[in-house]
Structures are given as structure tokens and as C-alpha cells.
């Protein structure tokens, strides 16, 4: 069993460097869009993230092509996925819009060049100041999450004498086979009950400055099958059709949210996406087909809004971290008998840098970028630098064990693949370790720093003492 796992992992490593559009190898090193990652890691302090603008563009084109059968589709990048300004700029330059979940996310999108009418505002808590900022800046949509919020929108729009364009977010009551904390359409905190949709729409229609555009939902994140998207879209379509009839209106759009998965495990023949959603299970085309099929049973002229995040940036980044310490330890049973010996490799990135590895037990392919063409044939445990017993990487190739070359030593650079979604956004400064820098590989293959590592001065400048 162990031999077959090792063989499979090394076959995948060969596929990564010889058949993946993102990766290559040179002088034994892993290259990302032609950039030698071992050499790059000597230019900047590790750990840091490396983004690929070409991969962002490819992912956006894949989504757009998937919706080619419905030309009237508008794509809003879920900026909570990664709101580094250089990444937002690449996404803006690629020609799509943005979705935000806080006033500061809205402000960042505006500052990088998105117009107000290219931004959708989501969230379960939008304070009056947030709503006033959104309405004042003429956002494309505010997705209303509660009647309480709606009353604030009404009052603020009257005060400003400005139109507030809104959708009503409803919960379609459709579960999905993803991580429990990523389900947002079944027993979730977001949205109104479907039964409240009519009352909410009637209230909006009586508000002088609030313009009702349609209904909104979001099924979940990293959903590995198309059926929940089809079911939830049908719920939204059926309710939209009914509301148009009973209210005598015509909706401008239907917003189906995001949730297109990214493959974190590539060996599809060995996994079941419904049991392990690290396998993507479906493509952007499958998502689009499920949505369009249901929408077209209602109308073909209505605008479809989508809010992908992970699908845009997930595969577009790697995390580079240096092997900074190593040791061999012995595990004993309670009677003092030797159970096994464990080879530990310590890298300078812990769960403060890559929190999903612990909080969601997320799987990432981990390779020695300095020795990428060498067989990864040694079982090791991989840990971070934090003063915390839980700061080690739990989701290995076999249980908690990872594979690296036997000759892996201190100073080697380790790469975590597919690290572009919900990673930088969730970093902390636990142990007063700095948040990482970010490097961008642009369309020409040139690299530039788009976010520097935190300095000591950054750590203390907010304290008052």
C-alpha cells in the first residue's frame, strides 16, 4: 500500500512538471510560468506567495467560455478570496467585475479601478455606514440579507436621494457535498427564508429609491457536483417566475453566486469527489450547464450574475517556504517501548500563513522545489515554526506523512501548490511572525513584488503605549 502511494505521488510529480500548463523544470528546480522558484526564493524573504497573472486570465477565460451559451452573463470575482491590490488589478484588467463583503473590500475595488457599477456588495452584517458608502458610490447591486438591513437601505437612500439597486438573497434549502462550514444554502446563516421573498419584494416596491433587480443565492464553496447548483437554480427560477406573476414585475437578473470547485487532488481515478471534495468533481462548464439549463426554462433574456472566487485564483498561486530545521525523533508507547522513528522537517510557514491546512484539513500537493526532478521517496512529518503543538501539516499523502526526497535538507525550498484562494486573506501574526510578501508573475513572465512582508514597525504601529 505504502509503495503504491509513493509510486502514485511520483507519477503525479512527473505530470506536474511535464504536463501541467503552469509548471516546468530547469536544472532540477520547479518552475512556475517559466520562473525558477528556487532562484526566486533567494530574492525575497520566505515564506511568500507567488501568483501567476497568466493563470488568472486562463481561469477567467474558462469561466467566460463556459457561459458562452448565455451571452448576457456578468462575472463578479469574490474579492474575499484574495484582495491583494496587484491581484485585483490583474482581475480588473482581465475584464470582469468584483464582489465585496465589507466596506474596505469595496474601497479596495474602487481604488484599483473598478467602477461602482462593477461591484456587488454581499454580507450578513452591513452597518449603516457600510450601506451609505455603497449607495453613495452607485454599486451595481446590494444583495439584501435581512429585513433589518433593508430598512436601513430604505432610510439611507431616502436621505441621499439616490437609487439603491438590490437583489434579495434567499436560502434555497439545498445541501451540498462540501465541508460543513462551506455550505451556505442549507441551514445556513445567510439569506432570507424563501417564504419571506414575496413580503420582502413587496416592501422594496413601495420604497421610492430602492430598485428591485432580482433574487440572489449562493450554494456553497468547493461543491464537487452539479446537482445542487441545478436544484438551487430551479428554486430561484421558480420563485422568480412566481414573483413576476403575482407582483406584475419583470426581473432584470438572477444571481446564482459562486462555488465552482478547484482540483486540489489530481488523481481522479483514485478518489470520489462526493466523499473527498479535494477532487473537484465538476468543471466550470458543468456549473454553467446546470445553471443555464434551469434559467432557460424561465427566460433566455434575463441577465445571469455569477460570483466565482476560488475558481479564479485557487490554481494561480504557490506558497514558497524554506526548510529551516530538521530532526529525528522517537515515538514511545506508555510503557517506554519504541514504536517508531519520525523524520521531522520544519519550514518557516505555519498555520498562521496557511490556515486552511489546519482549520479545514485542506490538502495541498507539497514538493521540494529545489529538487523537483528527484524522486520524492522519504516519508516525513512537516511542521511550521509556531510555538504551538498543533502547528504541523495534518493532511499528508498518507495520513499525516508527506513525501520529500531523501536528500531534502535545510535551505531547500518547498512549494505548496494551488495556494491562491483564501490563504493570504486568512493570515495572522500569531507569535508575532509577519504576514508574507506576495510576488506576481505577469503576462510577460516578469516578476515583481506586489505586497511586501510585514516589518517590525508594522507589528507595533497600531499599539498605543
From Swiss-Prot:
Modified residues (N6-(pyridoxal phosphate)lysine): 80
Catalytic activity, EC: 4.1.1.116
Record field: pH dependence: Optimum pH is 6.5-8.
Cofactor or coenzyme needed: pyridoxal 5'-phosphate
Binding site for pyridoxal 5'-phosphate: 259, 307-310, 422
GO BP annotation list: lysine biosynthetic process via diaminopimelate
Chemical reaction(s) catalysed: D-ornithine + H(+) = putrescine + CO2; D-lysine + H(+) = cadaverine + CO2
GO molecular function: diaminopimelate decarboxylase activity
UniProt keywords, alphabetically: Decarboxylase, Lyase, Pyridoxal phosphate
InterPro entries associated with the record: Ala_racemase/Decarboxylase_C (IPR009006), De-COase2_C (IPR022643), De-COase2_N (IPR022644), Orn/DAP/Arg_de-COase (IPR000183), PLP-binding_barrel (IPR029066)
Protein name: D-ornithine/D-lysine decarboxylase
Organism placement in taxonomy: Bacteria, Pseudomonadati, Pseudomonadota, Gammaproteobacteria, Enterobacterales
Amino acid at each position: 500500500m505504502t509503495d503504491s502511494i509513493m509510486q502514485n505521488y511520483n507519477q503525479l510529480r512527473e505530470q506536474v512538471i511535464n504536463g501541467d500548463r503552469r509548471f516546468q523544470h530547469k536544472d532540477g528546480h520547479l518552475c512556475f510560468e517559466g520562473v525558477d522558484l528556487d532562484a526566486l526564493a533567494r530574492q525575497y524573504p520566505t515564506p511568500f506567495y507567488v501568483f501567476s497573472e497568466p493563470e488568472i486570465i486562463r481561469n477567467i477565460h474558462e469561466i467566460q467560455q463556459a457561459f458562452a451559451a448565455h451571452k448576457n452573463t456578468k462575472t463578479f470575482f469574490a474579492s474575499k478570496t484574495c484582495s491583494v491590490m496587484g491581484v485585483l488589478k490583474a482581475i480588473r484588467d482581465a475584464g470582469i467585475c468584483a464582489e465585496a463583503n465589507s466596506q474596505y473590500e469595496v474601497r479596495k475595488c474602487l481604488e484599483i479601478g473598478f467602477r461602482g457599477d462593477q461591484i456587488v456588495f454581499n454580507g450578513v452584517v452591513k452597518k449603516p455606514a457600510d450601506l451609505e458608502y455603497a449607495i453613495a458610490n452607485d454599486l451595481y447591486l446590494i444583495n439584501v440579507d435581512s429585513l433589518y438591513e433593508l430598512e436601513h437601505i430604505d432610510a439611507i437612500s431616502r436621505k441621499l436621494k439616490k437609487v439603491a439597486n438590490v437583489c434579495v438573497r434567499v436560502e434555497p434549502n439545498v445541501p451540498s457535498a462540501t465541508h460543513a462550514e462551506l455550505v451556505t444554502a442549507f441551514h445556513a446563516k445567510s439569506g432570507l427564508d424563501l417564504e419571506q421573498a414575496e413580503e420582502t419584494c413587496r416592501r422594496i416596491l413601495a420604497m421610492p429609491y430602492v430598485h428591485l433587480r432580482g433574487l440572489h443565492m449562493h450554494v456553497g464553496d468547493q461543491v464537487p457536483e452539479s446537482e445542487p447548483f441545478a436544484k438551487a437554480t430551479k428554486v430561484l427560477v421558480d420563485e422568480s417566475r412566481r414573483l413576476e406573476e403575482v407582483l406584475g414585475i419583470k426581473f432584470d437578473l438572477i444571481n446564482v453566486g459562486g462555488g465552482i470547485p478547484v482540483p486540489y487532488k489530481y488523481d481522479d481515478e483514485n478518489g470520489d469527489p462526493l466523499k473527498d471534495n479535494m477532487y473537484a468533481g465538476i468543471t466550470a462548464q458543468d456549473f454553467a450547464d446546470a445553471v443555464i439549463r434551469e434559467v432557460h426554462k424561465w427566460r433566455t433574456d434575463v441577465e445571469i450574475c455569477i460570483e466565482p472566487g476560488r475558481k479564479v485564483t485557487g490554481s494561480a498561486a504557490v506558497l514558497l517556504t524554506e526548510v529551516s530545521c530538521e530532526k529525528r525523533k522517537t515515538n514511545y508507547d506508555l510503557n517506554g517501548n519504541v514504536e517508531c522513528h519520525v523524520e521531522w522537517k520544519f519550514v518557516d510557514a505555519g498555520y498562521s500563513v496557511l490556515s486552511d491546512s489546519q482549520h479545514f484539513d485542506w490538502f495541498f500537493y507539497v514538493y521540494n522545489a529545489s529538487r523537483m526532478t528527484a524522486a520524492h521517496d522519504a516519508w516525513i512529518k512537516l511542521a511550521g515554526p509556531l510555538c504551538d503543538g498543533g502547528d504541523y501539516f495534518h493532511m499528508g499523502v498518507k495520513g499525516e506523512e508527506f513525501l520529500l526526497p531523501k536528500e531534502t535538507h535545510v535551505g531547500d525550498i518547498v512549494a505548496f501548490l494551488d495556494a491562491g484562494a483564501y490563504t493570504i486573506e486568512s493570515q495572522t501574526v500569531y507569535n508575532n511572525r509577519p504576514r508574507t510578501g506576495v510576488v506576481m508573475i505577469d503576462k510577460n513572465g516578469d516578476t515583481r513584488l506586489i505586497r511586501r512582508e510585514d516589518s517590525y514597525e508594522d507589528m507595533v504601529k497600531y499599539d498605543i503605549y
